[in-house]
Each structure stands twice: as structure tokens, then as C-alpha cells.
Amino acid sequence: MKQLEAFRRKALGFPDEAPLAGQYDLVVVGAGIAGMSAAVSAARLGCKVALINDRPVIGGNNSSEIRVHLGGRIEEGVYKELGGLQKEFGPEKGGNAQPAENYEDQKKLDWLANEKNVTLFLNYRAIGVTKDGNKITSVTARHIESGKEQKFEAPLFSDCTGDGTIGYLAGADFRMGREAKSEFGESIAPEKADKMTMGASVQWYSVDNGRSSSFPDFSYGVEFNDKNCEKVLMGEWTWETGMNLDQIKDFERIRDYGMLVVYSNWSYLKNQMKENTQYRNRKLGWVAYVAGKRESRRLMG
């Protein structure tokens, strides 16, 4: 791997050391809802903030790539200000697996652009950290398209990656999966610890085409019949898979299988099911190409 890395750097004309993107008071890695909120909260307190995100849009699961609704209890009890930031950038419409415009990606980007103390780095994925003793001093991130790298220095870092990536790269203890019942006394925990997690959802929806439409009819590798097929017009978070696989190492495999199930089920509804009148004029309007992850590493410190 090191030889390949050196070859790639030389072929692309990249320097041996990633250039410094800047020095910041806080570097936030991951621009989902948590990362956006952390970055702007710090910026409004006077911090110079770098916000790094490995996708071309921000919002994480609430972006148009994944399309999970933004919701939760806010402004309740003694926590009257809890949720105030999210109200500033959150989309007006709710719901899962809705048209892309419902998730208002541009509204989120515009909201961040108005914060003069936040610099957003889109399409950069964190790949390494440097430490001084037990303290992280910099994060290196690589552009997912060009391969160019940049280094970000700061006294403070916020891991909002969802996978605990920065903590993991820094050598922090973490857990993944379920603890044994004996550890915390949870009544429904397994007798023995295992690696099972919540899965990842590949959401989708169909639209009325106004006329009969076709869909490729061949064996997708997942067999459906009238008893086990899902007779639905859309799929939300319940179209979840990968519970017994590694949500990091196997994530593309999990996503691919989720898509396979969507296409296999839709093919059955369109081509094999006898009573399929409600599907004849419908076509797939959208299928997520980025799965919505529900669980990953839990950093222990």
C-alpha cells in the first residue's frame, strides 16, 4: 500500500506532505446535522472554524442524497434554546424518501455561507491524524475526486463523521455491536456480546408515468413471490439491511444489496405479479445511491 501510495503521488504530481489548508480554532469533520450545528455554534462564539465534508452536499442523512426527515423534540422544558440552530437551516417540509427539493440542500449551504468564521471544504474525506502525545494536532483530508490532500491544524477537533473516524484514527477505544446482558443489565440484550448493529436504509419511491411503462425482467438474484414481495409504491427507512455486516468495511456491499432488493422487488411487481394494475403506469422515480446509516462505531474515549 505504501508503494502504491508513493507511485500515485508521483504520477499525479502531488507533494510528499499534504499542504497546510490553514490553522483554525476548531476543525469539525462531518457536515451532517451535528457537524453543521457544532461549526456554527463555535463560529458564533468567535472561533475560526474549518468544516470538512466528504460529499458534495451537506446535511448528512437529511440531504437530498439520502432523504431522511429532520425531526426531534426541541425547545422543551428547561432547554428552551435546544433546536434553535436546526430551525434556522432545516427544510420546511418533512417526510422520508421525498423529492430532492424537499431537503433544501442549497438552503443549508447558503446558511453556512453567511457565517464568516466558517470555511467549508466539500468533497474532502479525513484519512489521517497527527498527534502530540494523546492530543490530536492535525487532520489530513483527501479530495474524493482529485485525490489532492490538505492538512488542517487546530487545538480542538470535533468528530461528527458518524463513523467515529477521527477518534478511530487517533487510536481511541470504541465499540461496535451489542454488549452482553451481564454488562449493563439490559433485559433484551443478548447473553453474549456480538457485532450486530442497526442496518442501513436504501430508500426509494415510484411515480405515476401516466401510461404503461416497462421494467427489465430478469433474475436479479433475489427471488420474490406473491407472499414475500413488498406491495408498496415507495420504501422508507424500513428498507434496511446489513445488520450482521460491518457498517464501515462492508458498507458498499450493504448499499449494493439494498439496491438489489429494491430492483428485484420492483421487477416482480411490474412483471410477475398477476394483480398489478396499480403498478402498470408507474416507474421508479428515485432510488438512493447512498444508504442511510443508522449505527456505527461508538467512541469510548
What are these regions (language model features)?
Residues 27, 55, 161:
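Anionic group-transfer/hydrolysis microenvironments
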Residues 29-33:
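Glycine-rich Rossmann-fold phosphate-binding loop(s) that bind the pyrophosphate
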Residues 27, 75-76, 92-98, 153, ...:
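Second-shell loop/turn segments in exported
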Residues 2-7, 17, 61, 122-123, ...:
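Flavin (FAD/FMN)-binding glycine-rich loop and adjacent Rossmann-like elements that form
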Residues 36-39:
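Generic hydrophobic/aromatic pocket-lining and core-packing "Φ" positions
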Residues 1-7, 15-16, 21-23, 41, ...:
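Conserved N-terminal/central alpha/beta ligand/cofactor-binding core
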Residues 128, 140-141:
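A compositional/structural signature marking long, glycine- and acidic/polar-rich segments
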